[in-house]
């Protein structure tokens, strides 16, 4: 079904980039997963816990092994008494989760004799999610799957949540490295401005190919080798720390132009706040000459640069806050008004 509502929200907690299945994952550690779950249980009433993409790394492992790596954490959050809803917004590394749900929707229509094709964009919402099967019997938390973004009304202003991989389309220095180069040429001939559907169609072949690779383990190594080539040129063209994605490891201020380009396509050109992940660089900022606050959720993977924090999440209520998990609990890193 289509997702076009903007409900009033209480506290929202957003976390992303756990990458269950990848060798850099951290929350597969039972003690760390339990400690984070305990901290979340003490954050007061939570209207929604948003899993903002790359929960699973389906470019490295197939679905069941990846979920198995995250089972302890997923069971933990599903059992939180203070969380009302869990919303799963897939990213690029778990894009296949959305595609599976979309195909099931199409197949259900065909079984009813309905041969119409559901609208792919701007967003689709499904009750339940593949991970809801790990909820303990009797759990009151509800699960939903939404792709590629959700909006919520917080403190009277719109807040947009999305993983962030669509921002890669707007990177001026290295967008050609994937299918985006061809897409730009096609779009330029057909119309002056790309749509969200165009960007998704450009992203689809790449994500699809990478999600198939884990079924043939030898292909995973080839895919990672392809990325290493991209990274080499990215370091020459833009930054010394670029990894895994066009925007991976970029700072929030380096993403402002991409965010400006994407927001109108989401139908929310000037929200109060834009929350995303994808880059593995936690932070909070404000786009110059606007009232748009930007927050990045960071990641739960090992960082090559010890100076880059991980174990971070974002909380949105009356304002937006960035927290980090420490040995003593939740440490407030930054906050900004919406």
Language-model regions: role of each:
Residues 2-15, 20-153:
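Core catalytic region of metal-dependent phosphoesterases/phosphodiesterases
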Residues 159-258:
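Active-site-proximal loop/helix segment associated with metal-binding centers of metalloenzymes
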Residues 48-54, 84-89, 122-128, 188, ...:
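Low-complexity, flexible helical/coil segments
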């Amino acid at each position: 079904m289509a997702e076009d509502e903007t409900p009033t929200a209480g506290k929202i907690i957003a976390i992303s980039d756990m990458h269950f299945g990848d060798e850099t994952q951290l929350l597969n550690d039972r003690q760390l997963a339990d400690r984070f779950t305990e901290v979340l249980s003490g954050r007061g009433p939570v209207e929604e816990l948003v899993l903002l993409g790359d929960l699973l790394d389906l470019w490295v492992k197939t679905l069941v092994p990846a979920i198995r790596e995250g089972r302890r954490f997923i069971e933990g959050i599903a059992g939180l008494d203070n969380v009302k809803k869990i919303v799963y917004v897939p990213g690029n590394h778990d894009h296949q989760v959305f595609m599976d749900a979309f195909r099931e929707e199409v197949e259900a229509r065909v079984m009813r004799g309905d041969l119409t094709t559901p609208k792919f964009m701007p967003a689709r919402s499904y009750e339940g999610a593949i991970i809801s099967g790990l909820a303990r019997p009797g759990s009151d938390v509800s699960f939903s799957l939404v792709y590629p973004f959700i909006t919520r009304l917080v403190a009277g202003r719109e807040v947009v949540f999305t993983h962030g991989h669509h921002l890669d389309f707007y990177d001026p220095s290295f967008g050609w490295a994937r299918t985006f180069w061809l897409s730009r040429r096609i779009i330029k001939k057909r119309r002056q401005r790309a749509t969200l559907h165009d960007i998704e169609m450009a992203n689809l072949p790449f994500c699809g190919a990478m999600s198939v690779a884990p079924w043939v383990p030898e292909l995973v190594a080839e895919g990672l080798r392809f990325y290493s080539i991209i990274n080499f040129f990215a370091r020459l063209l833009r930054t010394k720390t670029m990894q895994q994605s066009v925007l991976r490891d970029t700072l929030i201020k380096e993403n402002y132009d991409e965010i400006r380009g994407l927001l109108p396509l989401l139908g929310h050109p000037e929200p109060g706040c834009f929350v995303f992940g994808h880059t593995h660089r936690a932070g909070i900022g404000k786009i110059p000459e606007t009232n748009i606050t930007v927050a990045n959720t960071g990641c739960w993977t090992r960082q090559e640069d010890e100076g880059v924090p991980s174990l971070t999440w974002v909380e949105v209520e009356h304002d937006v806050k960035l927290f980090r998990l420490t040995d003593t609990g939740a440490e407030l890193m930054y906050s900004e008004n919406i």
